[in-house]
Regions:
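Zn2+-dependent peptidoglycan hydrolase active-site motif and core
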Residues: 79-82, 96-137, 154-173, 178-179
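N-terminal Sec-pathway targeting helices
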Residues: 1-13
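Surface-exposed, glycine-biased beta-strand/turn segments
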Residues: 25-113, 120, 143, 153, ...
Length: 197
């Protein structure tokens, strides 16, 4: 009697534990905690506050630098990265992942030429874009609208631009090449965009 009363609960607990792990491990993988995350493995949309947002670089899903601490890729770049870098060639379309109001369209230090769009308590930053802006401050933008093009590595005619490449040519902020730096700020605080995919 003592044998059954002890081992039946133990076997039951082991069964629950094994079942839980077999369910939990794939879930970790699905959300990027076990394997690398590439948005095209799932969908090209993100979900924040139950509203759908769309991927800002259509056709380009390779992330070259993730949110958080990293080795700075170039002089002037911080070790804390407040967004993600999406590899895309110069001239590629950048679309608004959300509707909102343009609150900034200018050179923004290490971010280079940047467009900011606000929607409630969220601010979306699209950085290292072309200096030929397609939008202006105060303009209402619809989700999916082309708002900018991926900018070149080198930009000229930016007064007091401290960012330079190894040849001394001025760069589009702290950058080593053409890409989109995409960031989301919630209530003014940087959040990891990949947490919302």
């Amino acid at each position: 009697m003592k044998f059954n009363s002890f081992f039946i609960p133990v076997f039951f607990i082991l069964f629950i534990l094994i079942f839980s792990l077999s369910t939990f491990i794939p879930a970790l993988s699905e959300y990027g905690y076990v394997s690398s995350y590439y948005p095209n493995n799932y969908t090209n949309s993100i979900n924040i506050s139950s509203s759908n947002f769309i991927w800002p670089a259509p056709g380009y899903n390779k992330i070259t630098s993730y949110f958080g601490y990293r080795n700075a890729p170039t002089s002037g770049a911080g070790t804390y990265h407040g967004g993600i870098d999406i590899a895309a060639p110069t001239g590629s379309n950048i679309i608004a992942c959300s509707s909102g109001i343009v609150t900034f369209a200018d050179f923004y230090g290490a971010n280079g030429f940047t467009v900011k769009i606000e929607n409630g308590n969220l601010t979306f930053l699209y950085s290292h874009v072309s200096p030929t802006f397609l939008v202006h401050v105060g303009q209402y933008i619809n989700k999916g609208e082309v708002i900018a093009k991926v900018g070149p590595k080198n930009v000229y005619n930016v007064p007091n631009n401290p960012y330079k490449d190894s040849n001394g040519n001025p760069t589009n902020g702290a950058t080593t090449g053409a890409h989109l730096h995409f960031a989301i700020r919630k209530d003014g605080q940087a959040v990891n965009p990949l947490n919302y995919f």
